[in-house]
């Protein structure tokens, strides 16, 4: 049957986690107050504000309180969809203004080109919004990589720790589980993908990283698909 598609995690796998934590997250925290104030009547932003109130169980929270909630979620690394949507919108401004470029590991930049030449389908699955993923790969320090991808998945597909999310991906891309390889640095995500029947591989870029029973690689250079 063989592998026909590769689904990659982002932070820690294709992207340095430090770029997310030290550049993108602080930027979104700093920009949130002004962004919400200036865009609160935009339909998408307004929906995110309402969803934040609902999730926080604070239906009467004013804009300042909503901002506090969102900033707290960033510090807790919460995977709440309204936060991830707003972060994507804020980062779009940052990329557009040239305030940073998306960090992508060089070995993935080379590998994604190789996979594309092999006619393998490439997808990304992240807790960051689809828009944020597209921004990361289109404004990367390796150039625009978006044409190499066949699609992106985020929290709307499901929680990355839940088997059902990977079943949903399989249904969307219409491939059988053994035709799809999921690559991530997080053991719990690999367990969920494995439970859905997917092939799995753990990216171990740090020698101190926790590993399990999964096949491991330290670079995409080691991932050879026949």
From Swiss-Prot:
SUPFAM superfamilies recorded: HAD-like
GO MF entries: 2,3-diketo-5-methylthiopentyl-1-phosphate enolase activity; 2-hydroxy-3-keto-5-methylthiopentenyl-1-phosphate phosphatase activity; acireductone synthase activity; magnesium ion binding
Co-factor(s): Mg(2+)
Class in the EC hierarchy, top level: hydrolase
Record note on cofactor: Binds 1 Mg(2+) ion per subunit.
GO biological process entries: L-methionine salvage from methylthioadenosine
Pathway: Amino-acid biosynthesis; L-methionine biosynthesis via salvage pathway; L-methionine from S-methyl-5-thio-alpha-D-ribose 1-phosphate: step 3/6; Amino-acid biosynthesis; L-methionine biosynthesis via salvage pathway; L-methionine from S-methyl-5-thio-alpha-D-ribose 1-phosphate: step 4/6
Keywords (A to Z) from UniProt: Amino-acid biosynthesis, Hydrolase, Magnesium, Metal-binding, Methionine biosynthesis
This protein's record includes keyword Thylakoid: no
Pfam name, any one: Hydrolase
EC numbers on record: 3.1.3.77
Catalytic reaction equation(s): 5-methylsulfanyl-2,3-dioxopentyl phosphate + H2O = 1,2-dihydroxy-5-(methylsulfanyl)pent-1-en-3-one + phosphate
UniProt xrefs under InterPro entries: Enolase-ppase_E1 (IPR023943), HAD-like_sf (IPR036412), HAD-SF_hydro_IA (IPR006439), HAD_sf (IPR023214)
Family: Belongs to the HAD-like hydrolase superfamily. MasA/MtnC family.
Subunit details: Monomer.
Functional summary from the UniProt entry: Bifunctional enzyme that catalyzes the enolization of 2,3-diketo-5-methylthiopentyl-1-phosphate (DK-MTP-1-P) into the intermediate 2-hydroxy-3-keto-5-methylthiopentenyl-1-phosphate (HK-MTPenyl-1-P), which is then dephosphorylated to form the acireductone 1,2-dihydroxy-3-keto-5-methylthiopentene (DHK-MTPene).
Name of the molecule in the record: Enolase-phosphatase E1
Provenance organism: Shewanella baltica (strain OS195)
Upper taxonomic lineage: Bacteria, Pseudomonadati, Pseudomonadota, Gammaproteobacteria, Alteromonadales
Gene encoding the protein: mtnC
């Amino acid at each position: 049957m063989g592998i026909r598609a590769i689904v990659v995690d982002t932070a820690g796998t294709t992207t340095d986690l430090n770029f997310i934590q030290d550049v993108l997250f602080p930027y979104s925290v700093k920009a949130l107050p002004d962004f919400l104030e200036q865009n609160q009547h935009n339909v998408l932003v307004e929906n995110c504000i309402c969803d934040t109130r609902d999730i926080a169980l604070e239906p009467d929270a004013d804009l300042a309180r909503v901002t506090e909630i969102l900033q707290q979620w960033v510090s807790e690394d919460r995977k709440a969809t309204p936060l991830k949507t707003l972060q994507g919108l804020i980062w779009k401004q940052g990329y557009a203004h040239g305030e940073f470029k998306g960090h992508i590991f060089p070995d993935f930049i080379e590998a994604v080109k190789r996979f594309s030449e092999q006619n393998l389908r490439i997808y990304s699955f992240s807790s960051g919004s689809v828009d944020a993923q597209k921004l990361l790969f289109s404004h990367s320090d390796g150039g625009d990589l978006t044409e190499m991808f066949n699609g992106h998945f985020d929290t709307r597909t499901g929680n990355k720790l839940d088997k059902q999310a990977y079943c949903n991906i399989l249904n969307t891309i219409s491939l059988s589980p053994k035709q799809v390889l999921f690559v991530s640095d997080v053991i719990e995500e690999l367990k969920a993908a494995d439970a859905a029947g997917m092939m799995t591989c753990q990216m171990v870029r740090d020698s101190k990283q926790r590993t399990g029973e999964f096949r491991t690689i330290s670079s995409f250079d080691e991932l050879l698909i026949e």
